[in-house]
């Protein structure tokens, strides 16, 4: 029943979101980047190498990386120190902001949605994961304005670990 699920979620500290809240977070999820790039390296006579296509990125991220735990804290008013904290990745969660990329970046970091996923060098407003904002700032993006921050005090690396182990075991047994 519903109460049983709510108790399990509380016990595991998994947040229960309303539809409106889920829609806000969904703005930060864009799917994977797909584009054609030519990888070129001229080997010297004594060198050898190999190209490895990584197709298991999602399981690796789910196994090793941090996920939010518990309920978020919402910020709507900001001081200068909040801009610095966002830039340094001190808020773990989601950031709604106006951001300006540098003009000399070959591979823009932050996408926006049109008919397709677009990575451009235009100033834009959007909701992104805090680690994406930190990476963008490391590459020269400038936060123009903060509108909303939803961050989590607690994180865990164990949210999907058992799930990935289980599917990896099935995959290995069937190969």
Language-model segments: residues:
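Conserved acidic
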Residues: 1-175
